[in-house]
């Protein structure tokens, strides 16, 4: 069974834990209890493949930012979460993405942009803004509501699909490099 290491990142209070707990335990947590770091595991079937999701729910608070490099190193894919009623959390996505790319030493890291709390009427981040940002990053965008379950499972499953695509691409690139190296070998 394939295991996928997913990391949920974003500013404090955007609903990272609520989304994760909704996926794992099928219930909505409405009280805010800042996370330091929680780990969850769940076996699911995605596109006919049984897999194990190893989900790291991270701290959004700035005082825990020193821990970020460590969990970014181990993650295979990242849900970058902002709240649709919090413009600052949307602006912070850029910093999380840059840090992930720096730590992974790669421009190509599986990510999904997630606009959470779409059940709330007090939207300050327009859907089009988020779609444009995701398009500029070359990643999918999904609006979610941990409260109503809208899009939550889809966000995690889409991230797994992004990781699969990334692994496929990397293995194809690896095979191309191996083939190329065979043709360049000259013995004198």
From Swiss-Prot:
The modification N6-acetyllysine is found at residue 104. GO terms for biological process: Ras protein signal transduction. This is GTPase KRas. The keyword Acetylation applies. Residues 186-188 form a propeptide. Residues 167-188 are annotated as: Disordered. Ras proteins bind GDP/GTP and possess intrinsic GTPase activity. Plays an important role in the regulation of cell proliferation. Plays a role in promoting oncogenic events by inducing transcriptional silencing of tumor suppressor genes (TSGs) in colorectal cancer (CRC) cells in a ZNF304-dependent manner. The modification N-acetylmethionine is found at residue 1.
């Amino acid at each position: 069974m394939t295991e996928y290491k997913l990391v949920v990142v974003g500013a404090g209070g955007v609903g990272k834990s609520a989304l994760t707990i909704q996926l794992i335990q099928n219930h909505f947590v409405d009280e805010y209890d800042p996370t330091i770091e929680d780990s969850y595991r769940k076996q699911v079937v995605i596109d006919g493949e049984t897999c194990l999701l190893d989900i790291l729910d991270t701290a959004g608070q700035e005082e825990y930012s020193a821990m970020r490099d460590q969990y970014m190193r181990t993650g295979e894919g990242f849900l970058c979460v902002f709240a649709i009623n919090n413009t600052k959390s949307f602006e912070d996505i850029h910093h999380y993405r840059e840090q992930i790319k720096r730590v992974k030493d790669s421009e190509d890291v599986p990510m999904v942009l997630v606009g959470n709390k779409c059940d709330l009427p007090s939207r300050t981040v327009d859907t089009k803004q988020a779609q444009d940002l995701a398009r500029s990053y070359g990643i999918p965008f999904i609006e979610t509501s941990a409260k109503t379950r809208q899009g939550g499972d889809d966000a995690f499953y889409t991230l797994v699909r992004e990781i699969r695509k990334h692994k496929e691409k990397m293995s194809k690139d690896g095979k191309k490099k191996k083939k190329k190296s065979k043709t360049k070998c000259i013995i004198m």
